[in-house]
Amino acid sequence: MTLLEIIIVLGIIGTIAAGVVVLAQRAYDSKAMTDLVTNTNTIRTAIKETYGPTGIYPNEQVAGTLALTDATINTVAGANIPPIAQLVQLGKLSTSEAKNNISSNYFNIGNAHVGTAGVAAGATAIGDRAYFIEVNGLDQKQCRNIMLQVGNQWDYVEVHNTAGSSGAYASGDHLNLQAAAVTGGNGAGGVVRSLADTGNVLITPGLANGFCSDSAANSLVLGSR
């Protein structure tokens, strides 16, 4: 075999190897997305089973949720126990189901309300008859794809396109699921879908492409009654 033939063979091998690496990375990314979507659905069921009978959903505990580890999630206690830890300790979730495998944080859970009718002025907890899950640490493609996959199954979808990176949560507690939706554009953040009169929109690829910044600081908030 001549030197030229050796070079050609090595070039072919290198091209094949590069293709295999790309395919392997895509397969890994696809599995990570599938696992994350599955976990959000599992958590949604656990929340309804646990808090649905009373209709009163827990306050979010951002600092406590971010501080959780695989060991402490089974032992943390007290009045301010993170909702996700409470679900694990009740046997509603496994630790792997409770974790966002992309950001490596446990899912943030908090309460929400629908409108403000009949609420005393200045109240901080307005009904608490609804809830949300926040998924953080998403890049632009992950944020848009998860929104497309699950968004239309939820009453409320909101994008935080900054401050939602791994190790942080951007959503406040006591969300109003009747907040007005925005149209998006240029990687925007904001309410995509809601229970407002004009908020029950169908999330299409075109709509999703107007949200989520070109960074890994996106978080997706999914709310329901």
Where are these regions (language model features)?
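Charged, low-complexity, helix/coiled-coil-prone segments
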Residues: E5-G14, A71-A79, L222-R225
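Structured segments of extracytoplasmic/periplasmic soluble domains
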Residues: S30, A46, T50-P53, Q149-Y156
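Intrinsically disordered, low-complexity regions enriched in Pro/Ser/Thr/Gly and acidic residues
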Residues: G91-S224
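N-terminal single-pass transmembrane signal-anchor helix
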Residues: M1-R44
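Predominant activation on well-ordered alpha-helical scaffold segments within soluble catalytic domains
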Residues: N41-R44, K48, R144
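Short, glycine/small-hydrophobic-rich surface segments
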Residues: T50-L90
